[in-house]
Regions:
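Short cysteine clusters
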Residues: 17, 21-24, 255, 273, ...
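Flexible mid-to-C-terminal extensions adjoining Fe-S/redox cofactors in radical SAM and related proteins
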Residues: 1-6, 27, 31-36, 274-375
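Processing junctions and N-termini across compartments
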Residues: 11, 15-18, 249, 308-312
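Radical SAM enzyme [4Fe-4S]-AdoMet core and its adjacent flexible, acidic
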Residues: 32-38, 46-50, 130-132, 136-271, ...
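Conserved alpha-helical substructure of the radical SAM core
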Residues: 1-122, 348, 367-370
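Flexible loop residues that form catalytic
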Residues: 29, 80, 132, 199, ...
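A cross-family glycoside hydrolase active-site/sugar-binding cleft signature
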Residues: 9-11, 76-78, 103-107, 128-132, ...
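Receiver (REC) domain switch/active-site residues of two-component response regulators
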Residues: 100, 125, 192
């Protein structure tokens, strides 16, 4: 019998984007041959979602099979840039009623007023928008041209004025860290709808972009001003973890994300972690997909990913907004603090996360008891 999960992170056409972020993780992944050294600098491919399109047949099946197997109340759809797909809004409309929350990650450039109006009408959409800074220097690893950056910010401002809940995903690098305080002050204008989640640049090429040791005090200084920016920030404990990551030079704290969220792709590939695409666990579009999904949560890789101390090199460099789930499981934040974020605010998600934590604690207690008896 399959376990219940919180969410499915569905990645659509991950190698197709309208921006060319220098630190893009797709080309740093070993999951697929198509990812190898592929930093998405080629022209994006044309694709379409519609009744007779191959993409529609695939992603409809991926979403349905994962939801039916793991009873997930949360669907996150990301890319690439998903709005490069003609008709993507129709897929999102198909999925919205099936979930407690539909999380849509985008760089915002192709989001239209029609999209925003339809999102509002569904009532359960959270937008996760990628923007490292409102100023060009801090966002220049994403958008090197100042004129294009200005257009990107203009589009994102429209999203922030839409009334929809927005989580800003901001990669901290040696350029953006200089502008954290200015950026947060700018975002405060939209405090009724926005949450600001800064997190470290990741991946095997992160060394080129990560904040320098002499810049860590800039993060310390930002955290010292937590109260000034509190209306748009995650819990204070999030920044305690972030500072620990920087001061210790790597992740040393436990991750629970793979026990809660799984990652799938529009070609059907399944991998256990939404943060780092470690391994191909099988394909949910195969006729025997149930056998592949039966392995979820039970393989040696899962044991390594969920170990009390991070064991894999890739995990040592990982810290993302998903970490608030781990923080709740580790009693670093309360359920109320976790669910203040719009992604986890719906009552069914709140109840499920609390139950999954209790189930895990009971299993941990049983395991400890077995170990004691064995001695």
């Amino acid at each position: 019998m399959a376990i219940q999960l919180l969410g499915n992170d569905l990645v659509v056409n991950e190698d197709s984007c309208n921006l060319s972020c220098e630190y893009c993780l797709t080309g740093q992944s070993n999951l697929k041959q198509s990812h190898h050294q592929q930093l998405i600098f080629q022209p994006p491919k044309v694709d379409r979602y519609g009744d007779d399109s191959p993409l529609a047949q695939r992603i409809d099946a991926v979403s349905d099979r994962m939801r039916e197997t793991f009873d997930v109340p949360l669907l996150k759809v990301t890319g690439g840039e998903i709005f490069l797909v003609k008709g993507m809004i129709d897929f999102l409309e198909r999925e919205a009623p099936k979930y407690s929350v539909l999380v849509v990650q985008t760089n915002g450039v192709l989001v239209t007023e029609e999209h925003l109006e339809r999102f509002r009408s569904w009532g359960n959409v959270v937008l996760q928008v990628s923007l490292d800074s409102h100023l060009h220097h801090g966002n220049s690893y994403r958008v090197p041209q100042p004129s294009l950056h200005a257009k990107v910010v203009q589009r994102i401002e429209r999203i922030l004025r839409s009334g929809l809940p927005v989580e800003i995903y901001a990669v901290l690098n040696d350029r953006s860290v200089v502008e954290m305080e200015d950026y947060a002050a700018w975002l405060l204008r939209f405090a009724d709808v926005v949450s600001y989640f800064p997190f470290p640049v990741r991946g095997p090429h992160a060394e080129q972009y990560k904040i320098r040791p002499d810049q860590i005090p800039l993060v310390d200084a930002f955290v010292d001003r937590y109260d000034d920016f509190a209306p748009i920030l995650p819990p204070r404990a999030y920044f305690a973890r972030l500072l620990r990551f920087y001061h210790e030079g790597k992740r040393t704290f436990r991750c629970h994300v793979p026990r809660l969220v799984i990652s799938t792709f529009s070609d059907g590939v399944v991998t256990p972690c939404p943060n780092i695409w470690f391994s191909d666990m099988g394909n949910v579009l195969d006729d025997d997909y149930e056998a592949s999904l039966e392995k979820v949560g039970k393989t040696g890789l899962y044991q390594a990913l969920l170990d009390p101390k991070p064991r894999l090199a890739a995990c040592h460099g990982c810290f993302t907004p998903w970490d608030t789930l781990s923080m709740y499981f580790e009693d670093e934040i309360t359920l109320d603090e976790l669910c203040a974020a719009p992604t986890y605010a719906p009552e069914p998600i709140r109840k499920l996360v609390a139950r999954l934590k209790e189930d895990w604690k009971l299993e941990e207690a049983r395991a400890a008891s077995r170990d004691t008896l064995a001695v």
